[in-house]
Amino acid sequence: PSVLFFHGGMWVGKSLGDFVPWALHLAQQGIAGIIPMFRTRGDYEVEPMDILEEGREAWAWVHGNAALLGLDPARITVAGSDAGGLMALHVALPDHPARWSLFRKKAPLPPGPAAVALFRGVCDLTAQSAFKLGGMMPPDQRDAVNPLRRVQRGLPPLFASHGGRDRLLPWRNSERLAELWRKKKNRSRFELLDVADHTFYHFNVNAAYFEQLLNSWSAFMVEQGIWEYNEGMDAGLLG
């Protein structure tokens, strides 16, 4: 199994290192981590759709080269934080059928990911907290790519997590997405860390939160049959 991690930074800053601890710990369990580079508005003259499509292109490349990389194409998960979470959702969710003309004519995407994992991901582009992203788009384009408008049956399992004291991206939207996921007969789990803030998933900020989240995510993935249980998952990181 493997995970394709899309970093956060709200498409302004580069946060490539955020998921390195995750990739390193998962590697010890036999799970490969991939952290792609993509253009951001902070460094390039790109539009939101350019960035979202680069996420899909990364997914298509990894899936198409799975054999070369030694990966099982049926067990590749997509994950991300804030805007990277939006990219992961854009990979997993089908295009809004009424808005097909907004999307470029690209080669068909490969089959969807095995699962989606969000670490305080952007779920609703109409929310004030997501204005830095949704405000960059024309209203019709924003509505077409808004994850909450694209949830339907037949989606991969979703693991969504958030800090209860996140003042930048309130946790209610993550909970709402997980509930809507289940309402459409898909499997999901929402993990709320009550007293954690926006930085809750960073290993170098709070190792205890990191371990709690890693254990919960691992258990969920084992339940879905995507990851295989091994004793190292229960060993703990803090001793």
Model features per residue range: what roles?
Residues 2, 27-37:
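A fold-wide structural signal in alpha/beta-hydrolase
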Residues 175-178, 182-239:
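C-terminal catalytic histidine-bearing segment of alpha/beta-hydrolase fold enzymes
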Residues 125, 165-169:
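Acidic catalytic loop of the alpha/beta-hydrolase fold
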Residues 154, 159-162, 166:
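Short beta-strand/loop motif that positions the catalytic acidic residue
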Residues 147, 156, 170-180:
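Short alpha-helix in the alpha/beta-hydrolase fold that links the catalytic acid
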Residues 57-132, 142-143:
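Primarily recognizes the serine-hydrolase "nucleophile elbow" in alpha/beta-hydrolase
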Residues 15-22, 34-73, 206-210:
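Catalytic nucleophile-loop/oxyanion-hole region of alpha/beta-hydrolase
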Residues 1-9:
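Short beta-strand element of the alpha/beta-hydrolase
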